[in-house]
Design a protein with these regions (language model features):
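Conserved hydrophobic site in ankyrin repeats
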Residues: 125-128, 158
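Ankyrin-repeat C-terminal turn/loop position
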Residues: 132-134, 163
Length: 175
């Protein structure tokens, strides 16, 4: 994790070009986190070109270009991860694109959950939950998939999510 102080006024657009393990960028001012796909060398410029400065010198992020990159990315699981983060933080996300992202994730949910298990990524599973893509219709299957992969942390997250979102609150007499 790299934390850049608010006092920093300028960062070179290539500052993180060689950060192979960079998975997520968080923009505190916008309240946004975006998934950064594993970049082949020839695509690194595309990600860094998403940043721009307005006339006042404020750094901004080009969400529209990010969304178009997402549509062009060849690996479906990376597209699903990018879509989950966009749904979790839908800054400047048109309704039609939101529906397309939800359909993409729903279509590839099983493969996506198995990929999350393979990488043991609670961050990606939480992104699905925060994006509203963990539904009452699919939660039991998702629990079965994470259990089959022997990922207790992920199964535990799903069980807690199920308890918080899909279980009716009944009075508990236990001590």
């Amino acid at each position: 994790e790299i934390i850049i102080p608010e006092t920093v006024k300028s960062i070179s657009k290539d500052a993180f070009a060689e950060c192979g393990r960079l998975e997520c960028m968080e923009f505190a001012a916008d309240g946004v986190k975006l998934y950064v796909p594993e970049n082949p060398v020839y695509r690194k410029g595309e990600i860094s070109s998403l940043f721009y400065r307005d006339n006042a010198g404020q750094l901004h992020y080009d969400y529209e270009t990010y969304d178009s990159l997402l549509a062009d990315w060849s690996q479906i699981l990376i597209r699903c991860r990018m879509a989950a983060f966009r749904l979790e933080y839908p800054v400047q996300l048109p309704a039609a694109r939101k529906r397309a992202y939800e359909a993409l994730i729903a279509e590839h949910l099983k493969d996506l959950v198995y990929d999350i298990c393979k990488r043991d990524s609670l961050m990606d599973l939480a992104a699905l939950g925060n994006a509203g893509m963990i539904t009452a219709e699919h939660i039991e299957e998702m629990i079965d998939w994470t259990t089959a992969c022997r990922r207790g942390k992920l199964t535990g997250y799903l069980l807690e999510y199920q308890q918080e979102h899909f279980t009716e609150n009944t009075f508990d007499f236990s001590l």
